[in-house]
Amino acid sequence: DGLLSALEKIRDKIRYRHGRAYDKFRKKYDGVVEGFLKDLISSIKSYPLGEDIKEDLIEQYEGYLERKELPDSLADAYPGRLKRKLKEAKEETKALEEEYEDQFDEAMQDYLDLLTKTANSVLKKGEVAKGKMFILENKVTTDNKDRFEKIMDKEKVPLPKEA
């Protein structure tokens, strides 16, 4: 699709400009999350629990691992060591997010500006569909950090849709 490939060219420019900082942040952040969850899963495997319960818990935390998310909390039955480790992991990921926040906002603003600039340029050439799509992409991404994060993660983010 011509519109999506035109949009991907802009996304690639932004990834090229800001990708190193994002990848560095992502690697550290994901490392903290994965480290905690792998420790938690291996601890669960060694607990004297019924196999069904173990399997359910492991499956639950493997879901977190896949999404690269920390759980909000652990049940009271978990040892203090793991609760402390979760607290430390949360503090560390929060610090990493705060440390990277300005760079993320700058990358996102750069993307939004490039969309506007490109929209104006293609509209002057009479490419109305492309111009409107770039303007719409700017509009749907403006307050949507999750969408921009997916773009930076090189996920397939579809063409924008009217809200």
State where each predicted segment sits:
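Low-complexity, Gly/Pro
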Residues: 1-163
